[in-house]
Regions:
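Bacterial N-terminal signal peptides that target proteins for export
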Residues: 6-25
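Alpha-helical transmembrane segments
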Residues: 25-28, 129
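N-terminal signal peptide c-region/cleavage motif recognized by signal peptidases
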Residues: 31-33
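Sequence context of c-type cytochrome heme-c attachment sites
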Residues: 36-121, 126, 132-155, 173-192
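Cys/His-rich zinc-coordinating modules
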Residues: 158
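Functional cores that coordinate and move charged inorganic groups
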Residues: 167-168
Length: 192
């Protein structure tokens, strides 16, 4: 009789622990989802403040003047893009949502979170690194894990393949290691 009571008590205790763990897990998941939805886009000019310093390798200038990502939106008005659009019944590639999702951070961002960016940025810093409102501060940027919790996205092959894939009519074979080296703008200060 005593053994049954003990077993019953253990079972109820374990059941309560499992329920609480599940509730805590769900609460954390929901909190993470809600906070991720609150990351706002702040625009490349805000990144420029810190990321164009010589000691950091003038990252912004390298991106803006040398990296094709910053010119991605302009490429939709190229002769090649206009010709492709015409052949495929697209009135204007620079206004086509299927094209804009990869050629413009502004158009790819949720409308209610993009008030800090402009249409003409092409694929801006936040197109690859994530909306910067919660990780832009110097204190946060000095600690990678804080920055990631604040919305910083670490570059992975999967991230790049969201756009660099065979859905693009001008797709060229994508080699993450090789191509990442072409666009890298290392942070020489040791932050993020």
């Amino acid at each position: 009789m005593k053994t049954n009571n003990i077993e019953s008590f253990k079972f109820k205790t374990m059941k309560n622990i499992m329920k609480r763990s599940l509730l805590i897990g769900m609460a954390l998941f929901i909190a993470g989802t809600v906070s991720a939805q609150n990351f706002r886009y702040i625009g490349a000019d805000n990144c420029k403040t810190c990321h164009n310093k010589p000691e950091q390798g003038a990252q912004y200038d390298k991106w803006w003047y040398e990296d094709l990502h910053s010119q991605a939106l302009e490429s939709l008005s190229s002769e090649k893009a206009v010709e492709y659009a015409k052949k495929n019944g697209i009135a204007d590639a620079s206004k086509e949502p299927k094209c804009l999702k990869c050629h413009s951070t502004y158009h790819a961002a949720p409308e209610n979170l993009r008030d800090g960016i402009t249409e003409n940025e092409g694929v801006s810093c936040e197109g690859c690194h994530g909306a910067g409102s919660n990780y832009r501060g110097t204190t946060i940027m000095r600690n990678r894990s804080f920055a990631v919790r604040g919305g910083l996205i670490l570059q992975t092959e999967e991230l790049c393949l969201k756009c660099h894939n065979q859905e693009c009519p001008f797709y060229k074979w994508f080699d993450f290691k090789r191509d990442f080296e072409r666009i890298t703008h290392p942070n020489l200060s040791g932050t993020h």
